Curated annotation (Swiss-Prot):
It catalyses: a very-long-chain 2,3-saturated fatty acyl-CoA + NADP(+) = a very-long-chain (2E)-enoyl-CoA + NADPH + H(+); octadecanoyl-CoA + NADP(+) = (2E)-octadecenoyl-CoA + NADPH + H(+); (2E,7Z,10Z,13Z,16Z)-docosapentaenoyl-CoA + NADPH + H(+) = (7Z,10Z,13Z,16Z)-docosatetraenoyl-CoA + NADP(+); (2E,7Z,10Z,13Z,16Z,19Z)-docosahexaenoyl-CoA + NADPH + H(+) = (7Z,10Z,13Z,16Z,19Z)-docosapentaenoyl-CoA + NADP(+). It comes from Rattus norvegicus (Rat). It is a multi-pass membrane protein. InterPro entries: 3-oxo-5_a-steroid_4-DH_C (IPR001104), SRD5A/TECR (IPR039357), TECR-like_N (IPR049127), Ubiquitin-like_domsf (IPR029071). Keywords: Acetylation, Endoplasmic reticulum, Fatty acid biosynthesis, Fatty acid metabolism, Lipid biosynthesis, Lipid metabolism, Membrane, NADP, Oxidoreductase, Phosphoprotein, Sphingolipid metabolism, Steroid biosynthesis, Transmembrane, Transmembrane helix. PROSITE patterns: S5A_REDUCTASE. This is Very-long-chain enoyl-CoA reductase. Belongs to the steroid 5-alpha reductase family. It is found in: Endoplasmic reticulum membrane. Signal peptide: none annotated.
Amino acid sequence: MKHYEVEIRDAKTREKLCFLDKVEPQATISEIKTLFTKTHPQWYPARQSLRLDPKGKSLKDEDVLQKLPVGTTATLYFRDLGAQISWVTVFLTEYAGPLFIYLLFYFRVPFIYGRKYDFTSSRHTVVHLACMCHSFHYIKRLLETLFVHRFSHGTMPLRNIFKNCTYYWGFAAWMAYYINHPLYTPPTYGVQQVKLALAIFVICQLGNFSIHMALRDLRPAGSKTRKIPYPTKNPFTWLFLLVSCPNYTYEVGSWIGFAIMTQCVPVALFSLVGFTQMTIWAKGKHRSYLKEFRDYPPLRMPIIPFLL
């Protein structure tokens, strides 16, 4: 069997960093990263980006050396992705924060609304209902992170956790401050508005969970294989007939319901910002599906049926 020689150079300086001799033809990029780490332990595999061209795209971990457009002496270019952190840790941190922060305002701990309101309770039923809905939402997210989601990428840059937490934690504090404020005014149309909003919220939360379960069943544990998601017998998954990312559709719907329930401007703004970001993600996933699968259903839109 003919072995390969792999030379790894810095993508910026072109400096030679490592020379690997007698590499198996069936070796994957993941295995090459592990070999590279032995000579440069400060760059663990998750921190490495290897590519065929200094300005090219990163090679996938599952790419096999002999299937790449290289000779028996291959040159790969290395870029440092920076310190990495697992997606599970990021999500748990992102979602635990809003859950805890919101409850601080709900229980009116000292130094928030003034001494006379310390640990007092709102007289409005909608305030207590909003707390239950908000808490349920983030507890659901935490449990899904631990037991449902399967991540195609194991890590993300450490710096992103600060940006993400600022977004989630900041908005949670902002909306919680107004919803739990002693001077909070209930929705204009009273109980009927709250009931309608609660129905929207519950339906969308069930829908979101159903989509996450369907996506989980689509990818075997430990696998990175992608398949076209289709509706199942669960009616909540039928939205797959019309959109590529119904989990985002239901997520936006949940926050719209919460905004109607609380009639609170910060919640409406959070819904708008979230919708904008999820639309970007949905369009990206939709393009990936179209590129990867020639038989992808043509009727589907990224996030909103027939529109967007």
